[in-house]
Amino acid sequence: MAGASRLLFLWLGCFCVSLAQGERPKPPFPELRKAVPGDRTAGGGPDSELQPQDKVSEHMLRLYDRYSTVQAARTPGSLEGGSQPWRPRLLREGNTVRSFRAAAAETLERKGLYIFNLTSLTKSENILSATLYFCIGELGNISLSCPVSGGCSHHAQRKHIQIDLSAWTLKFSRNQSQLLGHLSVDMAKSHRDIMSWLSKDITQLLRKAKENEEFLIGFNITSKGRQLPKRRLPFPEPYILVYANDAAISEPESVVSSLQGHRNFPTGTVPKWDSHIRAALSIERRKKRSTGVLLPLQNNELPGAEYQYKKDEVWEERKPYKTLQAQAPEKSKNKKKQRKGPHRKSQTLQFDEQTLKKARRKQWIEPRNCARRYLKVDFADIGWSEWIISPKSFDAYYCSGACQFPMPKSLKPSNHATIQSIVRAVGVVPGIPEPCCVPEKMSSLSILFFDENKNVVLKVYPNMTVESCACR
């Protein structure tokens, strides 16, 4: 007991000496220190394996996962009782989040100027908010001159640290730069022991730049009379997140115009992602279709025998479906009857009896009335998997079936559909078709993808998944 007290007294003495010398006492068992996101020295966890340049990708992935989790947690009853589709309020009442990576401009007159290319912002996207994220390293390595001769505590010094941000608009055609505004950030507000990430709202600056059609923005990060820590390790580059509301996202073919417009997307040059995202990219798993042939998806025509695909490039390499092969027919006594038919090759596949029974059973089980049917869309099948990060596929569903008279209440027919079905059943007016089975309620889908400048974008597209069907 006396020995333990002596050891405790000795440890307290060393602790006081270290405080007198202005040193921070090192915690015992440093290997048990909790890992902090962005800390490359702490072990464990996928965050410790991320490269500094992947910080923006990690941020966008967390935002996508958060939205997708809330979207998946919706209940079927959440759509009832209202005409507006269910939509979580996570994107600040917007439907678009764009990320922009910075590029250090060492060749310009102002060294340390980080340039952002904002040309991906469209005219239809109204900026709701914008934030600049930047890293300044460890606060403990910042050299400060204390005004008091007696010495200052570490926390007292930290209160005087302030970062200045100078925003510039750049015009490389004229080799000119114009001051856009000044901002300041207090480092103590966002302190982290390992890597200090700071953020600053730049909404007004970007709105002003977009209004003047100035999409090349530069930020110069400095400190007031104090020296920022030297970069012992490469710091993550600054990045900008822009929350916007795209007014044209509900327009016809908005998904095709924004996602299919990446036909010249440079494959193999996407930014690095960690292991659980690389599988979502799968850039090399699909061969490009022939550019000289219009597919049925592009010309809006039904596929037929006149559409000739390159067998070696598409179907043999991809093989999304199991090949159906005709089995050898059993010997029968009706060979003479079979020979009497025309001697041309039949274009109908010959199935065995077991396959036909399964097809009939499946047809009997499926309702003939208007109902929601299952449809899974894989982005690899339509050639979009190279730039869409997540999801790889989604359940779209579709509506199909008859709306015959009398229509049950479960089909939720409109008054016009009810009258139309009666007129068709009576037959007074010839040529009247029956009402159509169409989607009644639909939900949105969030898609994470690369834009033409290889920036990560999150968009929430409305009316992507059928929730219920009705006769109209």
From Swiss-Prot:
InterPro entries: BMP3/BMP3B, Cystine-knot_cytokine, TGF-b_C, TGF-beta-rel, TGFb_CS
Gene3D superfamilies in UniProt: Cystine-knot cytokines (2.10.90.10)
Propeptide part(s) removed at maturation, as residue ranges: 23-362
Entry's induction text: Highly expressed in fracture tissue, particularly in osteoblasts, osteoclasts and chondroblasts.
Biased composition (Basic and acidic residues): 27-37
Alphabetized GO MF terms: BMP receptor binding; cytokine activity; growth factor activity; signaling receptor binding
Top-level taxon: Eukaryota
Subunit structure: Homodimer; disulfide-linked. Interacts with type II receptor ACVR2B.
Family membership noted in the UniProt record: Belongs to the TGF-beta family.
Entry protein name: Bone morphogenetic protein 3
Source species of the chain: Homo sapiens (Human)
Taxonomic classification: Eukaryota, Metazoa, Chordata, Craniata, Vertebrata
Gene from which the chain derives: BMP3
